[in-house]
Amino acid sequence: MFVALLTAISSFADGKYVVIDGLRFFVRTDTKEAILFDNSYSGNITVPEKITDEGVEYTVTSFANGCFSNCKSLTSVSIPSSVTSIGSWCFAYCEELKSITIPSSVTSLGEVCF
């Protein structure tokens, strides 16, 4: 159990949170992946396929659990083809959401995603 805990801590330590163009990501420095995280999003959101932080490029591969949850004035989301998974409760309680573009690259949708 101690080894598993150290592994989990090590995995989390290999990254950091960044905000790029109003979108909050956790970037994994080991795999060069970016995970979209929660924030107070509103209006029309276009998630980029790649982001750059401090000269390093990261590919956006997933949306964290609840990343858009309770964003009551979110109206549309465009998801890039680099994304393969969308977490649980990702779009829950988005009362004004009228349009979402989900590419065929998304192979995993979490529970109660909408």
What annotation goes with each model-predicted range?
Residues 19-31:
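Short, ordered beta-strand-loop transition motifs
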Residues 11-15, 20:
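Boundary at the C-terminal end of the N-terminal hydrophobic targeting segment
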Residues 1-8:
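Bacterial N-terminal signal peptides
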Residues 20-23, 40-62, 71-85, 94-108:
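Structural signature of tandem-repeat unit edges
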Residues 29-44:
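Secondary-structure transition/turn motif
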